[in-house]
């Protein structure tokens, strides 16, 4: 049975058992800061297990794409060297959310594995483990399924703590957990290794193929085990592992899927043997890299993007080891799409984007790969022990872009280790340990403050209202506020929009008889809107009724900018490609800022087209439609959900533009018609990190003011160059041309002066051990003049040493030169280090030319006077 057929057979079997087939979730976990990547099938169901979420099914099955290459679950260093470690794998799973439990879960698994209509594995080849205290699971296996007791192994707490066991599963330090039962396949006595729980269990004879977790608890941060609302089941079976069993091979790399990838990689790399560890690395890594890029991850120097960069660079290095001299990795995308595109259509739609990102990253790394390898080879050759120094590891990382695990790969091949402690010390100096301050100034959870209730937001339809105060907080404490206090007010209902989705919070006033509270910001804490500000006069206390009114003009400007971001997002996807996804935004009354995934700078032509497209949609003046519906209906309408945003069962779908140009989920405030935006102008485009671009723009009166300012600048420029609006470009070109010619004339004059100065200074040379030595200060010269004069002098002296200096803005500037024929006797770089230290500075360079500087001009004359003596003492 081929891998693709096995995947389909699994899903269809559980569908027949009443399970809903749920598509794989993204590799980027939604709204779960505890996970770097999706690494198990249950990740997308976490809130269901915790009872925080309900869906219209209680049984589910999926084939979940997973990545383990960072954080706690990190298989990267083993990939390519073992039979079963991968950065990317598929996890087959079936799940029960308070529906069936142990008996049904065990029966489902056994029937699929051993049933004649299914996988038909020989029962005598299967072993089972259970948690030592789980008598119920043991009895089901032994008495109901019929597995002999000698093939059922009880595993206790074997990791040094209560519930720390191979058979007590937990996703992380916190979260859903419970006892589990595992099914193992026995490859037979020809393979080394003992059954699970034995001293020889790490051998390859007995391989775990299915883990069935009985989800009973939620582990809190303090280690407490709380019962889940409903006992549930989470199972996982690695697709690649069970495929290897069915196809009668011992290594995952021997299954049909990997054999096809290895063959394609071998063809690209000129016929490398498919058994090569480096080729297995390449075949494995194309899967994780392609799927991560398809899910919106871009190479960068932090977080998920850095893990992706590490994997790409590891693949590039192993390709280099196999003889690749040009980018090759991106070429493997086509083979992967052919093999997995049917099961994962996003691979097909993202193919060009994947290839572009991989090619760009390969080309970037190629610039430093050879240099870094040479440095490492040199250090290894000079190594006296078996440990590569931490300073070398850090230099490779910091200067040449070598992730530490890549350096470890190379060390491992040579039987060497890394000095991790030294590396960490080197990293310490530049590691930014700053943590962003709490978004709200006060961390209410940490402070133990619970704000009861829920604020009803009325601001979609109203800009004011007569409301009642529920809570007043002064310095984080619940108490009445007096005039002058800075505090937080929570209303039962409010027209004030709280900051979320990139849109800033409203400002305005709360007023009542004898009192006034200035709202300077509105923020969200759970289900409550926090009105932050200053009590101008009167007293604030719970139960007080106030008139709440937002700054309406400010809200209107913000609405224009927010609606424009939706049109901009749609235009970017239409013009640059569907790989564009929102990475962040800021919408305030003055401007909009939109961050998005894209692998290169947006060209001026593309920016003009984007701007024109948005303005065309504005001019159409179509209504902005808002539909309140459920998530499934919203998806059917093609609504875009933004990464990082948490949506409930009921969502707000915003549609604007002709032919539903933009359809997004959004809880922000917006204009009624696109024409209300008025005008849209892009003010800047830039890169903020690898693979992420930023556009800033203005709308409405802000756009008009920007146009006016641009016009004023143009008129002033025209006046300065004595031209008109129409001729200003030609006039500026003429000024620049004249300036360039003047610079050439000045350079020529400086060259003549340098030649003349060189002739004069040559006469002051003193002879030291057969070398002519010149050391002189050139007042009024700059660094370039010093360099040119030094070159002139070297030509005139024949064989000698030149030191020239000047003082610019209170700082010493130094240049040292040694004629080529004399560099075997004395080095300009060594001389410069000595001189610079005398004037409180630093310097260095090549044997024939060096530069430096210093902070103490008062010691310059003494330093120059000592040059002949230094040459005499240090000449070789």
Swiss-Prot record:
What cofactor does its activity depend on? Zn(2+)
Subcellular locations according to the entry = Cytoplasm
| Keyword Lipid biosynthesis (UniProt) | no
Q: Name one GO molecular function term.
A: alanine-tRNA ligase activity
One Pfam family here: tRNA_SAD
**Keywords, A to Z?**
Aminoacyl-tRNA synthetase, ATP-binding, Cytoplasm, Ligase, Metal-binding, Nucleotide-binding, Protein biosynthesis, RNA-binding, tRNA-binding, Zinc
Positions with a binding annotation for Zn(2+): 562, 566, 666, 670
CC annotations in GO: cytosol
Kindly state a single biological-process term from the GO annotations of this entry.
alanyl-tRNA aminoacylation
Q: Which InterPro entries match?
A: aa-tRNA-synth_II/BPL/LPL (IPR045864), Ala-tRNA-lgiase_IIc (IPR002318), Ala-tRNA-ligase_IIc_anticod-bd (IPR018162), Ala-tRNA-synth_IIc_core (IPR018165), Ala-tRNA-synth_IIc_N (IPR018164), Ala-tRNA_ligase (IPR050058), Ala_tRNA_ligase_euk/bac (IPR023033), DHHA1_dom (IPR003156)
Report the principal subcellular site: cytoplasm
Catalyses:
tRNA(Ala) + L-alanine + ATP = L-alanyl-tRNA(Ala) + AMP + diphosphate
> What family does the database annotate?
Belongs to the class-II aminoacyl-tRNA synthetase family.
Q: Which NCBIfam families match?
A: alaS (TIGR00344)
Physiological role: Catalyzes the attachment of alanine to tRNA(Ala) in a two-step reaction: alanine is first activated by ATP to form Ala-AMP and then transferred to the acceptor end of tRNA(Ala). Also edits incorrectly charged Ser-tRNA(Ala) and Gly-tRNA(Ala) via its editing domain.
Present the record's domain note.
Consists of three domains; the N-terminal catalytic domain, the editing domain and the C-terminal C-Ala domain. The editing domain removes incorrectly charged amino acids, while the C-Ala domain, along with tRNA(Ala), serves as a bridge to cooperatively bring together the editing and aminoacylation centers thus stimulating deacylation of misacylated tRNAs.
Q: What is this protein called?
A: Alanine--tRNA ligase
Q: Which organism is it from?
A: Marinobacter nauticus (strain ATCC 700491 / DSM 11845 / VT8) (Marinobacter aquaeolei)
């Amino acid at each position: 049975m081929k891998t693709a057929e096995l995947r389909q057979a699994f899903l269809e079997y559980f569908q027949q058992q009443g399970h809903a087939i749920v598509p794989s979730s993204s590799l980027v976990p939604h709204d779960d800061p505890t996970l770097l990547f999706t690494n198990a099938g249950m990740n997308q169901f976490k809130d269901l297990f915790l009872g925080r979420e309900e869906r219209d099914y209680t049984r589910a099955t999926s084939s979940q794409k997973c990545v383990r290459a960072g954080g706690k679950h990190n298989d990267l260093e083993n990939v390519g060297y073992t039979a079963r470690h991968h950065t990317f794998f598929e996890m087959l799973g079936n799940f029960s959310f308070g529906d069936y439990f142990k008996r049904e879960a065990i029966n489902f698994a056994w029937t699929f594995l051993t049933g004649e209509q299914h996988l038909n594995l020989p029962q005598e080849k299967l072993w089972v483990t259970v948690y030592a205290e789980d008598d119920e699971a043991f009895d089901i296996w032994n008495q109901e399924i019929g597995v002999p007791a000698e093939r059922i192994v009880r595993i206790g707490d074997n990791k040094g703590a209560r519930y720390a066991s191979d058979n007590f599963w937990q996703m992380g330090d916190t979260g859903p957990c419970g006892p589990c039962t595992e099914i193992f396949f026995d490859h037979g006595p020809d393979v080394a290794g003992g059954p699970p729980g034995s001293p020889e269990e790490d051998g390859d004879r007995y391989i775990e193929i299915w883990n069935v977790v009985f989800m009973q608890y939620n582990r809190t941060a303090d280690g407490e085990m709380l019962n889940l609302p409903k006992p549930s089941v989470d199972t996982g079976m690695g697709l690649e592992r069970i495929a290897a069993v069915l196809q009668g091979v011992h290594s995952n790399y021997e299954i049909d899927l990997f054999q096809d990838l290895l063959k394609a990689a071998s063809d690209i790399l000129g016929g490398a043997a498919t058994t090569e560890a480096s080729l297995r690395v390449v075949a494995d890594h194309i899967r994780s890299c392609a799927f991560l890029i398809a899910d919106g991850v871009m190479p960068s120097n932090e977080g998920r993007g850095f893990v992706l960069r590490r994997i790409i660079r590891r693949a590039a290095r192993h390709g280099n080891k196999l003889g690749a001299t040009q980018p090759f990795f991106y070429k493997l995308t086509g083979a992967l799409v052919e093999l997995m595109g049917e099961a994962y259509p996003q691979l097909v739609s993202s193919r060009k984007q994947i290839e572009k990102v991989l090619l760009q990253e390969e080309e970037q790394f190629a610039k430093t790969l050879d240099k870094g390898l040479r440095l490492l080879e040199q250090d290894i050759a000079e190594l006296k022990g078996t440990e590569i120094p931490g300073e070398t590891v850090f230099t490779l990382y910091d200067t040449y872009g070598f992730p530490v695990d890549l350096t470890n790969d190379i060390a491992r091949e040579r039987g060497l280790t890394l000095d991790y402690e030294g590396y960490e010390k080197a990293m310490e100096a530049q590691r930014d340990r700053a943590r962003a301050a709490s978004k709200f100034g006060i961390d209410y959870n940490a402070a133990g403050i619970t704000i009861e209730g829920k604020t009803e937001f009325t601001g979609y339809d109203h800009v004011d209202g007569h409301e009642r105060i529920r809570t007043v907080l002064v310095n984080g404490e619940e108490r009445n506020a007096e005039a002058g206090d800075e505090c937080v007010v929570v209303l039962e209902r409010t027209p004030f929009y709280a900051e979320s989705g990139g849109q800033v919070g409203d400002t305005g006033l709360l007023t009542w008889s004898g009192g006034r509270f200035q709202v300077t910001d509105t923020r969200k804490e759970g289900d409550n809107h926090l009105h932050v500000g200053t009590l101008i006069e009167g007293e604030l206390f719970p139960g007080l009724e106030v008139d709440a009114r937002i700054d309406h003009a400010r809200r209107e400007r913000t609405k224009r900018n927010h609606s424009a971001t939706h049109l901009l997002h749609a235009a970017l996807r239409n013009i640059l490609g569907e790989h564009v996804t929102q990475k962040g935004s800021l919408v305030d009354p003055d401007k909009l800022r939109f961050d998005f995934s894209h692998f290169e700078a947006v060209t001026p032509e593309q920016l003009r087209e984007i701007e024109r497209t948005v303005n065309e949609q504005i001019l159409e003046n179509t209504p902005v439609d808002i539909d309140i519906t459920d998530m499934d209906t919203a998806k059917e309408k093609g609504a875009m959900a933004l990464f990082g945003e948490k949506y409930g069962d009921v969502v707000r779908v915003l549609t604007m533009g002709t032919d539903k140009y933009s359809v997004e989920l959004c809880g922000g405030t917006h204009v009624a018609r696109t024409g209300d935006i008025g005008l849209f102008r892009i003010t800047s485009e830039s890169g903020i990190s690898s693979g992420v671009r930023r556009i800033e723009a203005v709308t409405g009166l802000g756009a008009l003011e920007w146009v006016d300012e641009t016009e004023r600048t143009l008129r002033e420029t025209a006046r300065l160059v004595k031209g008109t609006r129409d001729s200003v470009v030609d006039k500026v070109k003429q000024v620049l041309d004249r300036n360039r010619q003047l610079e050439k004339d000045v350079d020529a004059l400086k060259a003549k002066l340098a030649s003349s100065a060189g002739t004069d200074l040559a006469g002051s040379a003193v002879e030291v051990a057969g070398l002519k030595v010149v050391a002189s200060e050139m007042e009024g010269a700059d660094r370039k003049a010093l360099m040119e004069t030094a070159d002139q002098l070297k030509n005139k002296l024949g064989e000698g040493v030149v030191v020239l200096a000047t003082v610019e803005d209170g700082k010493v500037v130094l240049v040292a030169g040694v004629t080529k024929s004399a560099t075997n006797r004395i080095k300009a770089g060594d001389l410069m280090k000595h001189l610079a230290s005398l004037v409180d500075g630093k310097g260095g360079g090549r044997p024939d030319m060096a530069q430096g500087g210093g902070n103490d001009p008062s010691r310059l004359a003494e330093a120059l006077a000592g040059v002949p003596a230094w040459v005499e003492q240090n000449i070789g």
